[in-house]
Amino acid sequence: MAIVNVNHFLKEVESTDLKIDAIASSELYKDATFFKPDVLNCIKRFESNVKVSQGQGDGLVLSDFKLLDDTEIDSIRKKSNKYKYLHYGVILVGIKAMLPNFRGMEGRVIVYDGACLDPERGHICSYLFRFESDCCYFGLRPEHCLSTTDVNLAKRFRFRVDFDCPQYEQDTELFALDIGVAYRCVNSARFLETKTGDSGWASQAISGCEALKYNEEIKMAILDHKSPLFLEEGAPNVHIEKRMFRGDKIRRSRSISAKRGPNSRSKETRGFRSLSARIERFGKDEFGRRASTSEAPPGRSVSVEDTDRPGKGNSDGSSP
């Protein structure tokens, strides 16, 4: 199951305020139509833009980064009396290079469940990105729902991103990372089908990315704990789009700057962490083997061509 039409997405993504807005709600859920404004209004969007700065010539790692901020989590929990489940319709990851001679540079993104104590069972997907243009993109559509009352809701989707990083002066911003999500609260899995009738797991290498299989290197990366870089988060942004005959379209985003702080080696906080060796020294096997298009290994990381997708969800609740 393809999540997006690649040509259409690449055309739209550069003309939107938020990258996640390049994917229409109607592509994610079959009941998200012009004739159902209540459904369109219940689909929320949130995006994080992170500027990654160099630190003393080391490679850089974004580790244990959470998908939603506290405001989004609080909003979801306030709806728990009305809705039992949370579903992510799509998670979009974009990596942008902001330096010369970027072509051929590589890195890796690992998505995992931060509440799972077994890294293999908690692994969601991994991608190798290689810059052939200045931007790389991939998307994933989880099959499972989450509980709106889960005390560990903020941990359930976490990210680790390894960047190949040449030597630059301290605090030079070299990469931008955009992680956007469209989600909705529901009471029934039957409302989670796309307009083509699919409801199973999907991930898609949209541009400059290849899926990786779970292996020992990915396991150690998930378990890795190193001193983080300093995270400086700015005030959240609210994007409002006026619409005729419907309520205003409201989305939220946040901007984060990641750089080496004065206490980055001694103070343990969540966020970016320094890497002792540059990623370009890693061999292909250390990044992880590319995922087969017909294989779904434990801790799945499969491409959209996988023909053995899980079945559709069952109807067991009411419409949002």
UniProtKB/Swiss-Prot annotation:
The keyword Hydrolase is assigned to this record: yes
Entry's Gene Ontology BP terms: proteolysis; transport of virus in host, cell to cell
Molecular function via GO: RNA binding; serine-type endopeptidase activity
Sorted UniProt keywords: Hydrolase, RNA-binding, Transport, Viral movement protein
Signal peptide: none
Ranges of compositional bias, category Basic and acidic residues: 278-289
InterPro entries given in the database record: Trichovirus_mp (IPR001815), Viral_movement (IPR028919)
Enzyme superclass (EC): hydrolase
Entry annotation: catalytic residues: H144, D171, S199
Region feature Disordered, mapped onto this chain: 251-320
Functional summary from the UniProt entry: May play a role in viral cell to cell movement by increasing the size exclusion limit of plasmodesmata and forming a complex with viral RNA to assist its movement. May also have a papain-like protease activity and cleave the genome polyprotein.
Similarity comment: Belongs to the tobamoviruses movement protein family.
Name of this protein: Putative movement protein
